[in-house]
């Protein structure tokens, strides 16, 4: 799934400022370590355009792929708690594969609202493969997570699963969203273990929410006809079902807002991008 522009009625600056969200709406928090979660947010908003959205990203501890599970759990709990103290949340989507693999139990134990996680789309990839070789492209944290191994054992016993962990690819996705160029040679170096195989994967699981941002660039490097699968659409459907199943949900008449953990030159440059996705303002979240 490549990042596609939303309808003009949603993304244009005029729409953001002139259609000040006046109808009360349930509040959904989308959280990621960086901007990759925008790929999941986009899928959710296409299904649920009338929610009140908060996008929070941890640009202080980014990237999460090399952090310990204990650190990630404590960090995510701290950030979600800080947002919840400022906004009545109806649902939280942890739009980060690495954080999802370790933090969901702790979040669900602490909070009463639904918490949705993102897991690698191994099951649908197994259905799509033609040569029986599926590649999982993720952060090293996700590749080595016990949850990922459980998914492979449950759904991929009849396939060969090739694992490739890369934090560099996360950085390249952030570079692209900030307006930078993604060098093809850098992608070739990252993907070399697969490109050098006699029979490389014909179906790739994009196991990090940053990676759909690079679908076009990856397609130029991977063998022709390689399919790329992510879990964004499935997460959107799950979110829609959970929202529709709730009763007496507290709603908000506030504008959409984005939170970061530190304001700097990078976040100044990112603000126009966030505005294009429907977040008129970006603030530092006190934690």
Curated annotation (Swiss-Prot):
Pathway: Cell wall biogenesis; peptidoglycan biosynthesis. The active site is at 96 (proton donor/acceptor), 208 (proton donor/acceptor). Its EC number is 5.1.1.3. Substrate binds at residues 32-33, 64-65, 97-98, 209-210. Keywords: Cell shape, Cell wall biogenesis/degradation, Isomerase, Peptidoglycan synthesis. SUPFAM superfamilies: Aspartate/glutamate racemase (SSF53681). GO terms for molecular function: glutamate racemase activity. GO terms for biological process: cell wall organization; peptidoglycan biosynthetic process; regulation of cell shape. It catalyses: L-glutamate = D-glutamate. Pfam families: Asp_Glu_race. InterPro entries: Asp/Glu/hydantoin_racemase, Asp/Glu_race, Asp/Glu_racemase_AS_1, Asp/Glu_racemase_AS_2, Glu_race. Gene3D superfamilies: 3.40.50.1860. Disulfide bonds: none annotated. Belongs to the aspartate/glutamate racemases family. Provides the (R)-glutamate required for cell wall biosynthesis. NCBIfam families: glut_race, PRK00865.1-1. This is Glutamate racemase. It comes from Yersinia enterocolitica serotype O:8 / biotype 1B (strain NCTC 13174 / 8081).
């Amino acid at each position: 799934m490549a990042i596609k522009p939303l309808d003009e009625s949603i993304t244009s600056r005029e729409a953001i400022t002139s259609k000040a969200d006046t109808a009360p709406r349930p509040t959904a928090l989308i959280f990621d370590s960086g901007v990759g979660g925008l790929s999941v947010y986009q899928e959710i908003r296409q299904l649920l355009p009338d929610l009140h959205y908060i996008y929070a990203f941890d640009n202080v501890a980014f990237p999460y792929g090399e952090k310990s599970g204990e650190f990630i759990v404590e960090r995510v709990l701290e950030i979600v708690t800080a947002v919840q103290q400022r906004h009545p949340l109806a649902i939280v989507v942890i739009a980060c594969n690495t954080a999802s693999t370790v933090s969901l139990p702790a979040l669900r134990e602490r909070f009463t609202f639904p918490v949705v996680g993102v897991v690698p789309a191994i099951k649908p990839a197994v259905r799509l493969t033609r040569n029986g070789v599926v590649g999982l492209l993720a952060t090293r944290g996700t590749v080595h997570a016990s949850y990922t191994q459980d998914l492979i054992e449950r759904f991929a016993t009849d396939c060969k699963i090739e694992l490739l962990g890369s934090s560099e690819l996360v950085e390249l996705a952030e570079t692209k969203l900030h307006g930078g160029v993604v060098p093809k040679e850098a992608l070739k170096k990252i993907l070399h273990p697969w490109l050098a195989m006699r029979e490389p994967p014909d179906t790739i699981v994009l196991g990090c929410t940053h990676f759909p941002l690079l679908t076009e660039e990856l397609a130029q490097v991977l063998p022709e006809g390689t399919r790329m699968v992510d879990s964004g659409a499935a997460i959107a459907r799950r979110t829609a079902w959970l929202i529709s199943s709730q009763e007496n949900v507290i709603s908000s008449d506030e504008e959409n807002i984005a939170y970061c953990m530190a304001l700097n030159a990078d976040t100044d440059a990112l603000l126009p991008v966030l505005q294009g996705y429907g977040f008129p303002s970006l603030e530092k979240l006190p934690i």
